[in-house]
């Protein structure tokens, strides 16, 4: 069983990337489970025809963990992709990472981990104990960073590199960075900047996903791009990402940058703007 986790800043496109990746993988004849590890609980929505499935944490609160079965928490989506949403606490109460911990404990008790590949879609703004659990407990052995060329997105990706590096010091866990996915925001020299960042931390870009309105059209139809526009160039990009991940053998313990190094790197790839807002 192959277990991978996609980490990145909130709003960067992790869930869109994860759902299209899962769709591409199941189209290859693999059995796939996608686990959304974000309180927004929308990771699997496009695999479920737009349905927001009940979260594990909500079900535990409502019915008690001991009363739940596998069919209560695992839902079947596009072409058989098995979908799970960890969920989070009520606003202003508790720890968001708790949903991930509770979900994994329940899925283990119910013997749910038996797919060819499991895709964890994980919030990466704050890599606290709960959100780091897929790495810390050895569930996800291959980590992929989803980022754009925006500084805050790169900052989150760099923090995840710090978490991987720290967790990898525990010889009992095998947790490695498999590559960087550039989800473009159409910034100047964005692919070069993200490629330079990947190189600096010891890794590489494994996919460049261009910004496209096709994603919005697909999601308005409650579908992934893979399902909505299977012959499009964007669909081919997601299929290529699936191929890269399935054949990847290049895994590293990353070397995170200091914040000053990261900012210097970002500045070197952005156009100079004077006090009047004019590019040079």
Curated annotation (Swiss-Prot):
Free-text remark on how the cofactor is bound: Binds 1 [4Fe-4S] cluster per dimer.
PTM comment text: The reversible ADP-ribosylation of Arg-98 inactivates the nitrogenase reductase and regulates nitrogenase activity.
Keywords for the protein's UniProt record, in alphabetical order: 4Fe-4S, ADP-ribosylation, ATP-binding, Iron, Iron-sulfur, Metal-binding, Nitrogen fixation, Nucleotide-binding, Oxidoreductase
Keyword Phosphoprotein: no
Binding site for ATP: 8-15
Known EC number: 1.18.6.1
Reaction equation(s) it catalyzes: N2 + 8 reduced [2Fe-2S]-[ferredoxin] + 16 ATP + 16 H2O = H2 + 8 oxidized [2Fe-2S]-[ferredoxin] + 2 NH4(+) + 16 ADP + 16 phosphate + 6 H(+)
NCBIfam families: F430_CfbC (NF033200)
HAMAP family per record: NifH
Subunit structure: Homodimer.
Function: The key enzymatic reactions in nitrogen fixation are catalyzed by the nitrogenase complex, which has 2 components: the iron protein and the molybdenum-iron protein.
This protein's name: Nitrogenase iron protein
Gene (UniProt): nifH
